[in-house]
């Protein structure tokens, strides 16, 4: 019985060695035909963690789970009219430029306001802008930019405005059933692999439509067919909530609106998280406002009555004064922002303030050494 078991083990080992050799030969042939890295063991990948780029909003980064938009993936931002979709996308553009990247904006709606984009922090002199005439042209331009590997972020505004050439050339009233959906499906087939390979973030802004005859359930849907829904790694539902009243002489005027951003699909972190942000008219997302709220909830900023304090120092009476303090003191803003991100595991605990102190100390030590050397030379 023991002999039989030993023989069976030898046969199994021999069979296993043959299979491994066959697999190695197959991998070599695939690599020869399709290039290095066409097939690899997951453990051999240099980077297994998904790389992200901040959305430009701390609250949204937390809701996304990974700390921002995943690189090499497709993101869809949709919602009702004037809900803040383009604002959210423009903050991503500003963030990409802030990190030294190149961003492109495909303006299919022909409605981008350069002054508003600049107010949100976008460097309009460096922004690549395209306003094509048809949906096919929009997507071809986006594809060429992505294929170049030189662009970090591409925003398409919006999918609903990607009108097929056949519809543009036709007469009003002509039926063009499924043309846009077919165009989007073909675009997703072509773009997805290139987006992943070049680590480009592709943001598609979309509108809402109502399904006719729906009696039960949600009648809302997005145009462009189902392809974008399937290929998107992240889908954000942006909804404006209540209006924000001004203070002082502007107390009777609406100066912004509270906006809810729900992550309805997320392939890199748990979905269905929500972010609540303040979108101020003419300014975009209030980064100081969201930081004060989140840091206060974590007790990084202490609140006693109407006063806000940080590290034992009062920074303002009322949220508006606290916002002004953080806006006037960017170093304190960055320090608090870093602590919040460390708390949520979005960055390692290497305080930028501490790093600056170490750098200053090293510069001081170098200066002392230079002075000592100068004294020795004189002697």
Curated annotation (Swiss-Prot):
Entry keyword set: ATP-binding, Cytoplasm, DNA damage, DNA recombination, DNA repair, DNA-binding, Nucleotide-binding, SOS response
Keyword Repeat: no
Cellular compartment(s): Cytoplasm
Gene Ontology biological process: DNA recombination; DNA repair; SOS response
Predominant location category: cytoplasm
Binding locations of ATP: 79-86
SUPFAM superfamilies for this protein: P-loop containing nucleoside triphosphate hydrolases, RecA protein, C-terminal domain
GO molecular-function terms, A-Z: ATP binding; ATP hydrolysis activity; ATP-dependent DNA damage sensor activity; damaged DNA binding; single-stranded DNA binding
One Gene Ontology term, aspect cellular component: cytosol
Chaperone as UniProt keyword: no
CDD domains xref list: RecA
Function: Can catalyze the hydrolysis of ATP in the presence of single-stranded DNA, the ATP-dependent uptake of single-stranded DNA by duplex DNA, and the ATP-dependent hybridization of homologous single-stranded DNAs. It interacts with LexA causing its activation and leading to its autocatalytic cleavage.
Cross-referenced PANTHER family: MITOCHONDRIAL DNA REPAIR PROTEIN RECA HOMOLOG-RELATED, RECA
Family according to the record: Belongs to the RecA family.
Protein name: Protein RecA
């Amino acid at each position: 019985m023991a002999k039989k078991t030993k023989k069976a083990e030898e046969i199994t080992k021999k069979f296993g060695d043959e299979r491994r050799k066959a697999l190695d030969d197959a991998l070599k042939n695939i690599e020869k035909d399709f290039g290095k890295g066409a097939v690899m063991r997951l453990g051999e990948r240099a980077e297994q963690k998904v790389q992200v780029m901040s959305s430009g909003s701390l609250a949204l980064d937390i809701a996304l789970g990974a700390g921002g938009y995943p690189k090499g993936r497709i993101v869809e931002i949709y919602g009702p009219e004037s809900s803040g979709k383009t604002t959210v996308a423009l903050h991503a553009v500003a963030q990409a430029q802030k990190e030294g990247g190149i961003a492109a904006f495909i303006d299919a709606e022909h409605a981008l306001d350069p002054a508003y984009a600049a107010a949100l922090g976008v460097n309009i002199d460096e922004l690549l802008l395209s306003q094509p005439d048809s949906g096919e042209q929009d997507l071809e331009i986006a594809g060429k930019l992505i294929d170049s590997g030189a662009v970090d972020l591409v925003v398409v505004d919006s999918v609903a405005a990607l009108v097929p050439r056949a519809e543009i050339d036709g007469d009003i009233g002509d039926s063009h059933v499924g043309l846009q959906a077919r165009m989007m499906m073909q675009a997703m087939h072509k773009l997805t692999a290139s987006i992943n390979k070049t680590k480009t973030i592709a943001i598609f802004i979309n509108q809402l439509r109502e399904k006719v005859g729906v009696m039960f359930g949600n009648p809302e849907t997005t145009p462009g067919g189902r392809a974008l829904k399937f290929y998107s790694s992240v889908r954000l539902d942006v909804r404006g909530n209540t209006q924000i009243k001004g203070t002082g002489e502007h107390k009777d005027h609406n100066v912004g609106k509270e906006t809810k951003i729900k992550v309805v699909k997320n392939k890199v972190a748990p979905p269905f998280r929500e972010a609540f942000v303040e979108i101020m008219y003419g300014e975009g997302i209030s980064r100081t406002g969201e930081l004060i709220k989140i840091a206060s909830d974590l007790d990084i900023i202490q609140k006693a009555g109407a006063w806000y304090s940080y590290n034992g120092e009062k920074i303002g009476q009322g949220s508006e004064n606290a916002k002004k303090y953080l806006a006037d003191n960017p170093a304190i803003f960055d320090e608090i922002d870093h602590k919040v991100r460390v708390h949520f595991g979005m960055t390692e605990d290497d305080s930028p303030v501490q790093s600056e102190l170490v750098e200053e100390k090293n510069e001081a030590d170098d200066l002392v050494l230079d002075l000592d050397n100068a004294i020795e030379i004189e002697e």
